[in-house]
Amino acid sequence: MNIKPEEITSIIKKEIEKYEKQIKTVDSGTIIQVGDGVSRVYGLDDCMEGELLEFPNDVYGMALNLEQDNVGCVLLGNEEGIKEGDIVKGSGKIVEVPVGEALIGRVVNSLGEELDGKGPINTNQTRPIEVKAPSIIDRSSVNEPLQTGIKAIDSMIPIGKGQRELIIGDRQTGKTALVIDTILNQKGKDVICIYVAIGQKQSTVAHIVNTLTEMGAMDYSIIVSSTAADSAPLQYLAPYAGCSIGEYFMNQGKDVLIVYDDLSKHAVAYRTMSLLLRRPPGREAYPGDVFYIHSRLLERAAKLSKENGGGSLTALPIIETLAGDITAYIPTNVISITDGQIFLESDLFNSGQRPAVNAGISVSRVGGNAQIKAMKQVTGTLRLELAQYRELAAFAQFGSDLDKDSKKRLEKGKRLVEILKQDQYKPLEVEKQVIILYTAVNDFLSDIKVEDIKKFEKELLEYVDTHYRELGRQIAEEKVLTDEIKAKLEVAIVEFKKIFLQEA
């Protein structure tokens, strides 16, 4: 076989022309210490704060401390098999979570990985967990109500779409029950609900998933779970991940409700990480920026302006207090960040008033603008009447003889307190709340025994539903109590009361 030297030369020239001289550079470092979910890495000269790092065994980490000669990282997975001397690579990205419609009805962890055994999540869209909050220009004022279905809240402490309303109270006062009822009440209202469980028991999360599934609420809900068994870094990331998932829907013009249960455990997880990274401790051993971790999370809740799609993200953070102490560090921080708080009291809870809302110190700073006019008309004096009742009840304990007017107020107060009680998993539509509260506030219950109030309420709603169905529809549509509606309503109440008193 005869090969000409020119042919060989041309083949070699072609191969040289084809050759692409590309050098792939990776910022890498060496582990000098690992343990307790944190690691120190030497090298990583171009590392950024919050950057996602690749450790051996498919474990990821996040850079938090950028020091002169090393980088302090937290591990977002199991540290088994990771040892001193291993190579760590920088990714140039920050932590992202999958977002999209595919997440609805699913249970995921802080990194968006499925936990419910229903197979992988089919979405190719991701979003960084840390995003800048919408600016003042991008927002509009809170002007639409978010109905919780709970009489005590929708009447006196109304919540608007895009608001941040803190739910605060001791353990076992019904904080989670209150938010689950709120989620159940969003059925058919085109609101996507996200429940973020931080440091909860796995059994508690499983119970919540079962409840929402049974009630048909998982069709519009997402659960982000980071249980007590997860590491502190994963618990720390959970609320930010949930918030990013919610923002995706908000940016599409949808309404989203997100619950953080609870931020006390979130602060404890951050404190654990900070102390392990040897950051200087401050008050109650929390690091100096513990206020900032909550403020930057809750500032992402917003009602967007029409130009930006008009979507909203309403946040209900939960804080657990110790012996009702709302002056502790984390409770005061979160109270100052949010637009109001609902305070739940163990004394009220134990005395049978559930939901155990203390109307005296609970407040909604912006929700009043969002409350429907019909509810405003009905409950204008409700808070004042309850306050007067509490004062009189305390005075009456001393057995003093009360005048006729005071006795009347006392009796009315008892009935108002009774009417505000509500069973769990039974949220009420706003028009039904208006009917019930109108009855109570306008003295239609004065001749009904206190112990019969619950029965009266249930049967009155059934009666109105059967004989005056258009009344509820009118209130829901017009959102205001016209003289015509009031007259019809009073006729219905008087008619039913006659029947009820005859049966009694």
Curated annotation (Swiss-Prot):
Assembly information from the UniProt record: F-type ATPases have 2 components, CF(1) - the catalytic core - and CF(0) - the membrane proton channel. CF(1) has five subunits: alpha(3), beta(3), gamma(1), delta(1), epsilon(1). CF(0) has three main subunits: a(1), b(2) and c(9-12). The alpha and beta chains form an alternating ring which encloses part of the gamma chain. CF(1) is attached to CF(0) by a central stalk formed by the gamma and epsilon chains, while a peripheral stalk is formed by the delta and b chains.
Binding sites annotated in the UniProt record for ATP: G169, D170, R171, Q172, T173, G174, K175, T176
Top EC class of this enzyme: translocase
Organism: Clostridium botulinum (strain Eklund 17B / Type B)
Keyword Transport: yes
UniProtKB keywords: ATP synthesis, ATP-binding, Cell membrane, CF(1), Hydrogen ion transport, Ion transport, Membrane, Nucleotide-binding, Translocase, Transport
Compartment annotation: Cell membrane
EC annotation from Swiss-Prot or TrEMBL: 7.1.2.2
InterPro entries found in the cross-reference section: ATP_synth_asu-like_sf, ATP_synth_asu_C, ATP_synth_asu_C_sf, ATP_synth_F1_a_nt-bd_dom, ATP_synth_F1_asu, ATPase_a/bsu_AS, ATPase_F1/V1/A1_a/bsu_N, ATPase_F1/V1/A1_a/bsu_N_sf
Pfam families xref list: ATP-synt_ab (PF00006), ATP-synt_ab_C (PF00306), ATP-synt_ab_N (PF02874)
Membrane topology of the entry: Peripheral membrane protein
Record has Lyase as a keyword: no
Domain of life: Bacteria
GO cellular component: plasma membrane; proton-transporting ATP synthase complex
Known catalytic reactions: ATP + H2O + 4 H(+)(in) = ADP + phosphate + 5 H(+)(out)
Physiological role: Produces ATP from ADP in the presence of a proton gradient across the membrane. The alpha chain is a regulatory subunit.
Protein family per UniProt: Belongs to the ATPase alpha/beta chains family.
Single Gene Ontology MF annotation: ADP binding
Main location: membrane
NCBIfam families referenced in this protein's UniProt entry, alphabetically: atpA, PRK13343.1
Residues of the site described as Required for activity: S362
Protein name: ATP synthase subunit alpha
PROSITE patterns, per the entry: ATPASE_ALPHA_BETA
